[in-house]
Amino acid sequence: MEKKRKREQRKLSRRALLAKKNGVNLFEAKNYQKQKRKVARLYEKIMNQRTDFLNKLSTDIIKNHDTICIENLNTKGMLRNRKLAKSISDVSWSSFVTKLQYKADWYGREIIKIDKWFPSSQICSKCGHKDGKKPLNIRDWTCPICHTHHDRDINASKNILTEGLRIQSLAWRQ
């Protein structure tokens, strides 16, 4: 869908240049106006697909789990990274978290937010050894203590779950 949007956007730009070259006002250029409506419909369709996906995913997660542990990410700061900005805004993380939160309230589920500074990808989920900071290009690593091989994302998700359950048990004790 993204390729189609780009192609239609290029057509719109070409139609604008052609109208400008012929000295026609863009409000009077019929082909430009038709293409503009077509591009707007594509943007709306993409937005509806993303919203539908987020609604279905959040509903599925909430219905199948009593406790959800998520990392409290700084999405505004992450959007400043030009290489990540498009993929982060496409995923719409903050919208997903909002949907999870209101559906959790609706269904009586609990969402535990883990601090963004928690070193989830640095800790071995097997033995608890903190291996230190790693650059983002390192996708998997082996713990020097227990020699367990970890995928960075799966290990981080296990650590986030463990930390969330620890926070939950501390809250129950009080």
What residue ranges belong to the model's regions?
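Positively charged, helix-rich recognition surfaces that bind polyanionic ligands
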Residues: 1-174
